[in-house]
Amino acid sequence: MWRIRRPPFRHILFYTSSSKMRHIADIRIAEFDYPLPDERIAKHPVEKRDECKMLVRNGQGHITHHAFKDLPSMVPQGTMMICNNTRVINARMKFQKATGASIEIFCLEPISPVDYAQMFQAKGSCRWSCLVGNSKRWKDEPLTKTLHIDSRDITLTAHRIGPHGNSWEIEFAWDDDSLTFATIIEAAGYIPIPPYLNRLSEEVDSIDYQTVYSKIKGSVAAPTAGLHFTQEVIDRLIANGITMRELTLHVGAGTFQPVKSETIGDHPMHTEVFSVSRRLIDEIIGQLTAHRHIIAVGTTSVRTLESLPYLGALIMQTPDIKPEQMHVDQWNPYQEQFAQFDTLQALQTLSRWFESNGIEVLTASTSIMIAPGFHWRIVDGIVTNFHQPQSTLLLLVSSFIDRQTTIDKQAISKTNASDGATTSEWRQKNADDNLSKPECQQKDESDNMESPECESSNDTKLEWQQQDNSDNKAKPEWRKMYDQALANDYRFLSYGDSSLLTTW
């Protein structure tokens, strides 16, 4: 049993009044706009993944510029870094009608079998929710495509069953029952690169648009924050005392869905399926208990991790909830009934629920919206790219860097109940927790500026960016950061450069 010393009431509760809920829903997406020239959108990655640029913004708002390969020297020992190990599938398939018309089918999510693992092992036939390009030219006739697999000709047939929400239900069938759908889609389709790249998929995208640690097939878009990692960077992180862990969230096409409403309250967040193990839940509990940092690699990892306490809260409200009912709604974090719970208690409840249901891995779903005013409970560091103007991902970034004191890492005694440190206090006592900053992040106390040794310890020049106060006073923090990235020739979006955002 975890020994928890409850902090004062104000440190564990986050009360969301109806007025605050209205304020969050009334946030105008136009406030999250910025000029992004097309030439700043990276069409391809840099030649070596870890040689892209990396902007580092700390909890005091100081910004330095590095190469991504410097990441291991930026992260304190004892930190847990959590990556999304999903793998992008060849989700786009082109069929040619006898008339010559080209029909494109874009697989979104499985219908039958509904489980991703079972879907890719399906033989003979399966059904998907799909988008259809040039749909008006496709009547009721089946579409066929000849595939060449292991020196054999395989016929793949697509039948349009009917509407499925905002998409179509498509049945795929193939004339060799020995082949799985994983083999079929690998041969029939191609990687669905983001639409804003304004180019066709290339053969090299099948490598470039996958993370080096991708394992579990199911995404139709890459968790792009992870594209910069090389095995060398991962090995150095581990050697420096960083715990590397994985979860799975299958990225859907909704990640590219623009916000069309004037306010975010009218924007329906897309739903994505994720999987987490009981072991990871228990390790997160241990990390929070020991006051150690948790860095999420990418916004998909953020959404998964920050959804976990709300799954625990759902169980506390409905103890007999079934696995298939485990879903976090986009507004749950801002509703009063989900505000007044302790994060660790919720996670421990979730861990016990795993045991009582006899499962080791939970598959659930989330449509969580992380916007300014969100109560961050788990993540206190993010590795992320630079996102599109007026996107929900930009809302997430703004929420994180403006969070200040809203983190809910409780003041838990490390060894006994006599330690009364609050969440904010333990960050000042990081030496006792072996959380001292890496040398290249230490500052000279005499002038509060970076030491010369730090500058010489990296291949890239480390420079505190001086800004015109009169020009920046009215700008939100996210905009100041993005302006610096633009001014320093950063490349944006999926194949672009990286950033490390921390609260310390």
Can you annotate each of these PLM segments?
Residues H11, Y15, Q404, Q410, ...:
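Low-complexity, intrinsically disordered or signal/transmembrane-proximal segments
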Residues M1-M21:
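N-terminal mitochondrial targeting presequence
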Residues M21-K409, E463-W464, D468-W504:
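Surface-exposed, charge/polar-rich loops and edge strands
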Residues H11, D408, D432-N434, N448, ...:
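Intrinsic-disorder-associated, low-complexity terminal segments enriched in Asp/Asn/His/Tyr and depleted
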Residues T16, T405-T406, A411, T415-A417, ...:
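Ala/Thr-enriched low-complexity intrinsically disordered regions
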Residues G420, E425, A431-D433, E439, ...:
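Acidic, glycine-centered low-complexity repeats within long intrinsically disordered regions
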